[in-house]
UniProtKB/Swiss-Prot annotation:
Disruption phenotype: RNAi-mediated knockdown results in thinning or even complete loss of commissural axons in embryonic nerve cords.
Family: Belongs to the commissureless family.
Protein name as annotated: Protein commissureless 2 homolog
Organism from which the protein derives: Aedes aegypti (Yellowfever mosquito)
Residue numbers covered by motif PY-motif 2: 172-175
Cell compartment(s), UniProt: Cell membrane
Originating gene: comm2
Family annotation (InterPro entries): Commissureless
Length: 292
C-alpha cells in the first residue's frame, strides 16, 4: 500500500505582491541585520561545537558585494524605483561600493584631463609669445643696421619697444625721416655745412590723372600749312557747300596759315598744324568741288 502512494513535491512561485509585502513589512536595514545575525549565530555555534574560541570581529561581520547584489536584485524584482540613496518609502537604499568606486574614478579622470589640457594651452601660449618677441627683436636689429649703414648720428624719433609699423617691416623710412636724411646729406655735401634744404612735396594721386593739354597748348604758337590740291596752281576755290573739318586747337593759340598749291588732278585739301614748342600735329580735311 505504501508503494502505491506517489511522492509529490509542490513548490509555489511567489509573485510581485508577496515581495512587496515582505519589503514593506521589513525594511532593508532590519532585514540585513537579521540576516547577518543569523549567519553569525550559525558560525559561532559551529565553531563552539568544534571547541574553538570565537573572536569579537567574527561576531560583527561587514557587508560584501554578494549581499549588495542580492538586495539589488530583490529591489529590481519588486519594482520599487526611488531616488539615489533613499527608497520610495523613505528608508535608506544600499548601493554597490564597486559602482561608487567607478564613479569616483571617472570624476578623477575628468579633472586630470582638464588639468593636462590647460597646461598644454599655457605651454603653447608661452611658446608663441617667445617667437613673437624673437621676431620683434630681429626686426629691430635689422632696422638699426639699416640706419647705421646710412651714417646717421641720431636715432629715429620713435620708441624702440613699440610694435613694428609698415615702415619698419618694409625697411623704408617714413616721410619725415626721409626729409631729415635728405637735409643731413645736403649739409654733409656742402662746404660750409649750411645749405638751404630742398622742399619736398608729396605727389597727389588726383593730379596724375588730370588732363593738362590745355595748359600745355595755352602759351604755344602754332603754324598752319594748308595743302590745296586743285586745278589752278595759284589759287584755290572752295564752294559754298564744301565740308570743312577745323583743326582742334585752343582758342588762345595764335595760328599762321599758309596755302601751298601743288599739281592738279587732286580735289582734296589737307590742313596740318605744326607747333613750334610742342610736338602736336593736327589735321583738317576739306572736301571741295571744282567750280564750273
Amino acid at each position: 500500500m505504501i508503494d502505491s502512494l506517489e511522492s509529490k513535491i509542490t513548490f509555489e512561485i511567489p509573485n510581485n505582491l508577496d515581495f512587496n509585502k515582505f519589503i514593506r513589512e521589513n525594511n532593508y536595514s532590519s532585514f540585513w541585520q537579521n540576516l547577518h545575525q543569523q549567519e553569525t549565530a550559525a558560525r559561532v555555534a559551529a565553531m563552539s561545537s568544534l571547541g574553538m574560541g570565537v573572536s569579537e570581529p567574527l561576531r560583527t561581520s561587514e557587508y560584501n558585494a554578494s549581499d549588495f547584489n542580492l538586495l539589488s536584485s530583490l529591489q529590481n524584482f519588486a519594482g520599487r524605483a526611488g531616488p539615489v540613496g533613499f527608497s520610495a518609502d523613505g528608508s535608506e537604499q544600499l548601493l554597490d561600493p564597486t559602482y561608487e568606486r567607478f564613479i569616483g574614478d571617472v570624476w578623477v579622470g575628468i579633472v586630470l584631463t582638464l588639468m593636462i589640457l590647460s597646461s598644454i594651452f599655457c605651454m603653447c601660449s608661452c611658446f608663441l609669445y617667445h617667437k613673437f618677441r624673437q621676431w620683434q627683436r630681429s626686426v629691430l636689429t635689422a632696422r638699426s643696421q639699416t640706419l647705421s649703414s646710412m651714417d646717421l648720428e641720431t636715432p629715429p624719433p620713435y620708441d624702440v619697444e613699440s610694435l613694428p609699423s609698415y615702415t619698419i617691416v618694409s625697411g623704408l623710412p617714413s616721410y619725415n625721416d626721409a626729409i631729415e636724411q635728405l637735409k643731413q646729406k645736403q649739409q654733409q655735401k656742402s662746404p660750409g655745412g649750411h645749405l638751404e634744404p630742398v622742399k619736398l612735396q608729396r605727389p597727389s594721386v588726383i593730379k596724375l590723372f588730370e588732363s593738362q593739354s590745355q595748359d600745355l597748348l595755352a602759351g604755344a604758337k602754332l603754324e598752319e600749312i594748308r595743302y590745296n590740291f586743285a586745278n589752278n596752281l595759284t589759287t584755290s576755290v572752295v564752294s559754298e557747300n564744301s565740308f570743312d573739318v577745323t583743326p582742334t586747337t585752343s582758342s588762345n593759340t595764335a595760328v599762321n596759315a599758309t596755302t601751298v598749291a601743288v599739281a592738279p588732278n587732286f580735289k582734296t585739301q589737307v590742313s596740318t598744324s605744326m607747333p613750334k614748342k610742342f610736338t602736336v600735329c593736327n589735321y583738317s580735311v576739306e572736301n571741295e568741288r571744282s567750280g564750273s
